[in-house]
Amino acid sequence: MKRKIFFGLILTSSIILSGSSLTKQIIDDNKKPDVNSGVTNSNENNNNGNTFVPEDSDSIEDSNVNVTPPVDNKKTIFIYLNPSVQTKNFYYGNLGTEAQHMQDIAHIMYEELKDIPFIHVDCNTYFKTLSLKEAVAESNSKHRHIHFALHSNAGGGSGTEVYTKDSIEFATKMYNTFLTLGNFNKRGVKVQNTLYETNNSKAEHTALMEFLFHDRKDEALYLVNNKKTIANTMVKGLIEFINENYW
């Protein structure tokens, strides 16, 4: 992957460094829909008229996320990515499992984040496969600024939702970021203290994303065919959140 980190430079056409602000270059999002998020404790909006963007056309390597923190504030941000380990949750039409596809997305995110200066990222993926409790314990073993859990949903519904105990700003950021990819059913940001992961994570900001419903044909196909796009978009959301809250 070609990645260039620039300190104190002005790059024509792609990157603008203003004062001590964060420099970042992120993939362009064409034809972004307007997104209005809500914070709720129950499901909302049953519109099933989903419209999805095309399958991945460019690799993650061709869509760089370049970041240069300000020189005078080199705060290292610690992130933990925890994809689903649910190997028995099968996608529509035997297209794989929730664990398989969420780990794929998390691994791409990990590869994108690990080379960014002043970001330290851990990921419970292929080479670990920790249980849920083990992953939360590993996340809690050091101070984390961000804990992000990746899941797909089931049960006959449709659309996107995210759960959090008290990190509403972070959860809303990741929710809105994913919704830029298509006209998905907006199920909302759910404040809840009964999920083990969101309730027991000690990170400053914790959210559990349910991207789409994997038992629905169109949504399962979208997740399977657009993992690089999803990963890159979620990295974009993370970087923007870090920029807004830490750098």
Each model region followed by its residue ranges:
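Sec-dependent N-terminal signal peptides of Gram-positive bacterial secreted proteins and lipoproteins
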Residues: 2-24
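Non-membrane alpha-helical structural segments and their capping/turn regions in soluble enzymes
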Residues: 99, 103, 168, 172, ...
